[in-house]
Amino acid sequence: MIALIQRVSRASVTVEDEVTGEIGPGLLVLLGVEKDDDEQKANRLCERVLGYRIFSDAEGKMNLNVQQAGGSVLVVSQFTLAADTERGMRPSFSKGAAPDRAEALYEYFVARCRQQEMNTQTGRFAADMQVSLVNDGPVTFWLQV
């Protein structure tokens, strides 16, 4: 399971001219689900995303996680993160989970974030989405479990 996380000043996702999720300061989480992923990996990734210390403390050091910084999370499904790009000029998506399984794990990940009392907004699984963000830093990390 892969999360590309970006520290943002604000972010939103729109589907068919409807804003489905919008946050102020926090994390934009682009989430990719691979074939061998399961609930245990989703739990671990959720723990890492919410606990990752990439927000500045009073001394300007990256020492606070999103919860400590009072931020929110916007989770957007992105199957292209599971692409195999090692060869050729066209990505292969053979490493990605089947759509039904990917959606179930995406929803599970979102539920785990919400269980941690995290303000969690979302896109719409498998939809054509427009994601807008202001990357703060920029600060972007690839987390994989």
Curated annotation (Swiss-Prot):
It comes from the Bacteria. GO terms for molecular function: D-tyrosyl-tRNA(Tyr) deacylase activity; Gly-tRNA(Ala) deacylase activity; Ser(Gly)-tRNA(Ala) hydrolase activity; tRNA binding. It catalyses: glycyl-tRNA(Ala) + H2O = tRNA(Ala) + glycine + H(+); a D-aminoacyl-tRNA + H2O = a tRNA + a D-alpha-amino acid + H(+). A Gly-cisPro motif from one monomer fits into the active site of the other monomer to allow specific chiral rejection of L-amino acids. The keyword ATP-binding does not apply. An aminoacyl-tRNA editing enzyme that deacylates mischarged D-aminoacyl-tRNAs. Also deacylates mischarged glycyl-tRNA(Ala), protecting cells against glycine mischarging by AlaRS. Acts via tRNA-based rather than protein-based catalysis; rejects L-amino acids rather than detecting D-amino acids in the active site. By recycling D-aminoacyl-tRNA to D-amino acids and free tRNA molecules, this enzyme counteracts the toxicity associated with the formation of D-aminoacyl-tRNA entities in vivo and helps enforce protein L-homochirality. Keywords: Cytoplasm, Hydrolase, RNA-binding, tRNA-binding. A motif (Gly-cisPro motif, important for rejection of L-amino acids) lies at residues 137-138. Homodimer. GO terms for cellular component: cytoplasm. This is D-aminoacyl-tRNA deacylase. Belongs to the DTD family. Its EC number is 3.1.1.96. It is an enzyme of class 3 (hydrolase). GO terms for biological process: D-amino acid catabolic process. Gene3D superfamilies: D-tyrosyl-tRNA(Tyr) deacylase. It comes from Klebsiella pneumoniae (strain 342).
